[in-house]
Amino acid sequence: MLKIHTIMTTVMSLLLVGTVNANAIDDDISYLQKEWAIINYETVEDNREDKFYVLAKKAKEIVEKHPDRAEPLIWEGIILSTYAGAKGGLGALGLIKEARNRLLDAEKINPNALSGSIYTSLG
């Protein structure tokens, strides 16, 4: 009886950890989406570059937190691409290359993540 209880406790703990991890990735992706939308659509143009810079740093942290998932890489690519647009000029070229690389890295993990957003973003 004790063995069954131990097994059940272990299984329930693993399920809980999986749920927590699933919720963590969902929360992180939701955060990136919401912040991107606020910066892109509601922030005064003169402030966008700095805000996208900060969000790009946060996206990188989230990618490092979930290295086996494509979704954070896709959002990092989208954020870097939009940051490049806000930055403009020659300084944006490096950001564009970096964004493309993130999207290609995401494609290697899961080409269908976020309903194929990789291909929409790559053009």
State what each model feature region is.
Residues E98-L103, L122:
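Hydrophobic alpha-helical segments of small multi-pass membrane proteins
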Residues E45-K60, A92-R100:
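Helix-turn-helix repeat elements of alpha-solenoid scaffolds
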Residues I39, L55, I62, A84, ...:
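Alpha-helical solenoid scaffolds that mediate protein-protein interactions
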Residues M8-V17:
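Bacterial N-terminal signal peptides
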Residues M1-M8:
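Bacterial N-terminal signal peptides that target proteins for export
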Residues A24-E42, P67-K87, N112-G123:
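Amphipathic alpha-helical repeat scaffolds of TPR domains
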Residues G18-A24:
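Sec/Tat signal peptide C-region and signal peptidase I cleavage site
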